């Protein structure tokens, strides 16, 4: 992944997230303004009220901000200073890195919106995905081992897709 990238800015995006056309320019503007790391807002490719509600919360820089669906941009130098992703994590790796980012600098949410697939919600239901995410996030917050996080999430969701 990141070790093979050659640019000065790293941009991590899930395969089911569609970047907007202006994302490169938006990243450049954020970096010029002095932000070392951040993400975009997102919306789902679904018009259901509950998914619109989820999307609305991505404008806030709180405890749950910076998860993979929101993407992540970070300067290469800052990424290297932080030691990159913790390779123990194959789930919640984004939240673990963002947690370290927020200890060192302001985390910036670019006020533009990416589109994310709602497939996981269609296959599992909104409530089931929310409860699985909340459960695994709580385990992560209390320091439960990464392999147990992945196992728990796979059990809770029918397709075992990542958070």
Q: Where are the regions a protein language model picked out?
A:
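Short aromatic/hydrophobic "clamp" motif used to bind/position activated sugar donors
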Residues: 10
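Hydrophobic helical membrane-anchoring modules
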Residues: 102-163
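The conserved acidic donor/metal-binding loop of glycosyltransferases
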Residues: 14-20
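Short active-site alpha-helical segment characteristic of glycosyltransferases
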Residues: 91-103
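Conserved donor NDP-sugar-binding/catalytic core segment of glycosyltransferases
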Residues: 21-49
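A recurrent flexible, glycine/aromatic-enriched loop bordering the glycosyltransferase active site
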Residues: 37-45, 57-77
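Short, well-ordered alpha-helical scaffold segment located
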Residues: 77-81, 113
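Short, conserved alpha-helix that lines the donor NDP-sugar binding/gating region
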Residues: 1-3
């Amino acid at each position: 992944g990141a070790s093979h990238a050659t640019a000065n800015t790293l941009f991590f995006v899930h395969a089911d997230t569609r970047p907007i056309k202006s994302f490169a320019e938006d990243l450049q503007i954020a970096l010029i303004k002095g932000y070392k790391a951040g993400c975009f807002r997102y919306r789902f490719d679904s018009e259901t009220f509950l998914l619109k509600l989820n999307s609305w919360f991505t404008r806030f820089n709180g405890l749950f901000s910076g998860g993979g669906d929101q993407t992540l941009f970070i300067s290469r130098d800052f990424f290297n200073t932080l030691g990159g992703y913790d390779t123990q994590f194959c789930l919640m790796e984004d939240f673990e890195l963002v947690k370290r980012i927020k200890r060192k600098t302001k985390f910036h949410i670019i006020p533009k919106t990416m589109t994310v697939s709602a497939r996981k919600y269609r296959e599992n239901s909104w409530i089931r995905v929310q409860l699985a995410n909340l459960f695994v996030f709580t385990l992560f917050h209390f320091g439960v081992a990464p392999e147990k996080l992945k196992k728990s999430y796979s059990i809770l969701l029918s397709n075992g897709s990542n958070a």
